[in-house]
């Protein structure tokens, strides 16, 4: 088993017969996902993405694909917010669902998330950025079901193998003995509820914060409900307030 810092970025020659491990993953994720990294579908996914990056622009950059797992070790996961696939505009995606890099315009769905936070969490002040790393560092796993996308083509990497991998991530989180709150927004994410079987976990579902469904999202108060569920289980709540100034 070897770390590969340019995994899914540049070809590495013949297909390896063993696990291919992205660089910088916490030990807990390496252990929990070892079978996935060795699975034939994962090697096929790597081959697909190497060719995609050779012929097209792919987001996020190869070094950022697994940031959700890097920033939030399995043993620290308290909340999971599941997205569908990365933003497909230039410079937006950096491996965390709903988040964008500092200096990038805040996308409409995230603007709506901030609006709901304002009404749900007393004192929340929307920052002028969309960089959600501070949540990830508190144990909020910001996971997309599909971790890459071709530039300008939403859902273009669906059905290529990512879903098998991220389902394994969800199952690993489901196996945690401590309570985890799963936040599932929209029909796509809500289908993943079937993977969440442990009775001590909590699922919070609603419409997606996209402008297309925002009227059914607003007023659902997911953030205070997350904290109430955590505190009920003796866990510290999430500080949803994001820093005013950030840098990568």
UniProtKB/Swiss-Prot annotation:
Entry keyword set: Cytoplasm, DNA damage, DNA repair, Hydrolase
Subcellular location: Cytoplasm
Taxonomic lineage from the root: Bacteria, Thermotogati, Deinococcota, Deinococci, Deinococcales
One GO cellular component, as annotated: cytoplasm
GO biological process: base-excision repair, AP site formation via deaminated base removal
Reaction(s) catalysed (UniProt annotation): Hydrolyzes single-stranded DNA or mismatched double-stranded DNA and polynucleotides, releasing free uracil
Active-site residue list: 85
One Pfam family recorded for the sequence: UDG
Protein's job: Excises uracil residues from the DNA which can arise as a result of misincorporation of dUMP residues by DNA polymerase or due to deamination of cytosine.
Name recorded for this polypeptide: Uracil-DNA glycosylase
Matching SUPFAM superfamilies: Uracil-DNA glycosylase-like
Gene Ontology molecular-function annotations: uracil DNA N-glycosylase activity
Gene symbol of the encoding locus: ung
Chief site of localization: cytoplasm
Hydrolase as UniProt keyword: yes
Protein's UniProt keywords contain DNA repair: yes
Alphabetical list of Gene3D superfamilies matching this protein: Uracil-DNA glycosylase-like domain (3.40.470.10)
EC class (word): hydrolase
Similarity field: Belongs to the uracil-DNA glycosylase (UDG) superfamily. UNG family.
Enzyme Commission code(s) on record: 3.2.2.27
